[in-house]
């Protein structure tokens, strides 16, 4: 069945590949975002609503940590403080 194929032709397809993996030129290395709270020593506070606005979308949703770059500990605290600020009417629940 495979006797008709030329082995040199089959091997020439893999000449430009290393270890059978094709190099992906579209892959980019991204610098890991650092937590603003860990770097500065500052903690999220519901009274600082101008600073909390940076972590909210235009619709009023809380941005995820993969976008903001905050650590898991500070992301949980940030969400809690945003919810407190909403309850105290310092931040809107929904923006229109």
UniProtKB/Swiss-Prot annotation:
Q: Which residues form the signal peptide?
A: none
Q: Which UniProt keywords apply?
A: Ribonucleoprotein, Ribosomal protein, RNA-binding, rRNA-binding
The GO terms describing molecular function are:
small ribosomal subunit rRNA binding; structural constituent of ribosome
List, alphabetically, the Pfam families matched: Ribosomal_S18
Q: Which GO terms describe its biological process?
A: translation
Task: Work out whether the entry's keyword set contains Ribonucleoprotein.
Answer: yes
Q: Does the keyword rRNA-binding apply?
A: yes
The protein's job, in short, is:
Binds as a heterodimer with protein bS6 to the central domain of the 16S rRNA, where it helps stabilize the platform of the 30S subunit.
Family per record: Belongs to the bacterial ribosomal protein bS18 family.
Per its record, how is this protein called by name?
A: Small ribosomal subunit protein bS18
From which organism does this entry originate? Answer: Borreliella burgdorferi (strain ATCC 35210 / DSM 4680 / CIP 102532 / B31)
């Amino acid at each position: 069945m495979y006797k008709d194929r030329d082995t040199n032709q089959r091997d020439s397809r893999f000449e430009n590949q290393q270890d059978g993996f094709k190099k992906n030129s579209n892959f980019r290395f991204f610098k890991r975002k650092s937590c603003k709270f860990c770097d500065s020593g500052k903690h999220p506070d519901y009274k600082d609503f101008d600073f909390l606005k940076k972590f909210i979308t235009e619709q009023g949703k809380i941005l995820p940590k993969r976008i903001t770059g905050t650590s898991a500990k500070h992301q949980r605290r940030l969400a809690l403080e945003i919810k407190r600020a909403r309850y105290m009417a310092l931040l809107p629940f929904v923006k229109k």
